[in-house]
From Swiss-Prot:
Pfam families found in the cross-reference section: Ribosomal_L17
Native species: Pseudomonas savastanoi pv. phaseolicola (strain 1448A / Race 6)
Entry superkingdom: Bacteria
InterPro entries linked to this entry: Ribosomal_bL17, Ribosomal_bL17_CS, Ribosomal_bL17_sf
Keyword annotations: Ribonucleoprotein, Ribosomal protein
PROSITE patterns per the UniProt record, alphabetical: RIBOSOMAL_L17
Gene3D superfamilies: Ribosomal protein L17
Assembly with partners or alone: Part of the 50S ribosomal subunit. Contacts protein L32.
Family of this protein: Belongs to the bacterial ribosomal protein bL17 family.
Stated name of the protein: Large ribosomal subunit protein bL17
Designated gene of the protein: rplQ
Length: 128
């Protein structure tokens, strides 16, 4: 029985899941819009939203925690200098998940994950 067990396994080992969501979070913060499967998108929320909440209070300790979770100095800079300030007054719900049909190969449900209030300009291709 899996009573009170949170999270999805996604047919991966725990280390693979951790690395995958770390990479997906970095891609999301870099491009501000990514396309992935719906179950991965829903799990990505649990990784990405706490990082934005962490970035709302700029301190050395919080920057080190963010670097530990993303392993990217550029993304840590963007989190604290741009995204933390952008969402300073928002109490959560920084991501929007939009369903976008099914993948051709295996009919998996697909979704766009985007940052709410992101600047919209030109033709932006989502990161896959």
């Amino acid at each position: 029985m899996r009573h009170r067990k949170s999270g999805r396994h996604l047919s991966r080992t725990s280390s693979h899941r951790k690395a995958m969501f770390q990479n997906m979070a970095v891609s999301l913060f870099e491009h501000e819009l990514i396309k992935t499967t719906l179950p991965k998108a829903k799990e990505l929320r649990r990784v990405a939203e706490p990082l934005i909440t962490l970035a709302k209070e700029d301190s050395v300790a919080n920057r080190r925690l963010a670097f530990d979770r993303t392993r990217s100095k550029e993304i840590v800079g963007k989190l604290f200098n741009d995204l933390g300030k952008r969402y300073a007054t928002r109490q959560g719900g920084y991501l929007r998940i939009l369903k976008c049909g099914f993948r051709a190969g295996d009919n998996a449900p697909m979704a766009y994950v985007e940052l709410v209030d992101r600047p919209v300009g030109g033709s932006v291709e989502p990161a896959e």
